[in-house]
Amino acid sequence: MDKLVSVVVPVYNAEKYIYNCVESIMRQVYKNLEIILVDDGSRDSSPLICDKLAQQDARIKVIHKKNGGVSSARNVGIEEVTGDYLMFADSDDIVDEYWVERMVQLAECWKVNLVICTYRLCKNTYEAMVPINHEKAFEPTWAMSKDEFYNVLGYMMTFRETMFAPWNKLFVTSIVKEHNIQFPEDMSYGEDFLFNLKYLEYCNGVIETREQLYNYIVQNADSLEAKYKADLFENQTRLYKAAKKFMIDHNVYKGYNVSNISYYYTKRVLASIVNQFHDKNDKSSLNTRKYVETIVNDLEVQEAVSYANLHETEMESCFTDMMMNRQYEKIYDELLKIDAGIKNRPANIRYKNEANMPYGIKWIPHTFKSIKKYGMFITFKRITGKISRKLRRK
């Protein structure tokens, strides 16, 4: 008989999405499932929908609890699971019908206890999903022992987005429970990575499939990076310190691991600084300057910047040089120019594609809301190969 796989789904005010999510799990080719829906004190009709779904399928168990956040909901779900394997899904996403089967097959075939799949990023729709040719795609992208994986952890953090989330992974339940691995409940951002990092301590190997088995639905295209996160720097520093300690403990904090993790952290520090210019930030200009000064003078930041000399774009390099010289006022002034300059004049911006856009330019959409009251126009000049076009935004 197939091993039992437990799927934990935290639910909070997801009445628009939860049915599609759970239905996609119920339709799995792999049938031996335990689906645990953890209602985290929802104020909409999500609890009722969850209960109705449980009446339709005996594999579904619903837990209702007071609101405590996504980490709390996942931890409660972990306490209830009885399966051999453990997986997670977010209530506003949907999964491919082979999501569970392929992950289990890889775990059993390669005898590893951590399997990772890739995913699709879908904006506001379930319609743009192209069926996968599973016969062609069922090959691992790579397979590594845990020691091999430790040696490339910095690279995986920096260049592989599959490292951070829990929903594209298959875990062994006994490892999670025996070592009391939980999601930190005192973090608003990045808690998933700390769970994964703790699990890596005890896994024997890691494998990744190229199949995009998970569909990550972005309900608001601006929500991923445009939200103001007051504790972004503190959370990112916590992740960096945890990863650095992990590398030191396993004697792999050297070579490219050092440069890659330093580059990862430096980019997050820059994001934290730019985040201070969000229109939701209620700090005064003086307090914002002081906060930027605190970030730039942080010892961890200074160390990371000194090693992060690889892969940098021109603007990143410019800001990195300023950070190394602790020129925090110049950083503040330069970022202020990015923000204020758009309000006062057209911005002609040249880039080949979004991935290669200068770092600060990625954040220009943050200013769109703030300039509406000025009635100004922004002209974007986008270049893709030899094709050029202008976009006017009001």
Regions found by a protein language model. Name each.
Residues 278-394:
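Membrane-interface aromatic/basic loop that binds lipid-linked glycans or pyrophosphate carriers
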Residues 91-233, 237, 250:
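Donor-binding/catalytic cores of nucleotide-activated saccharide
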Residues 211-220, 226-252, 268-303:
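Catalytic core of nucleotide-sugar-dependent glycosyltransferases
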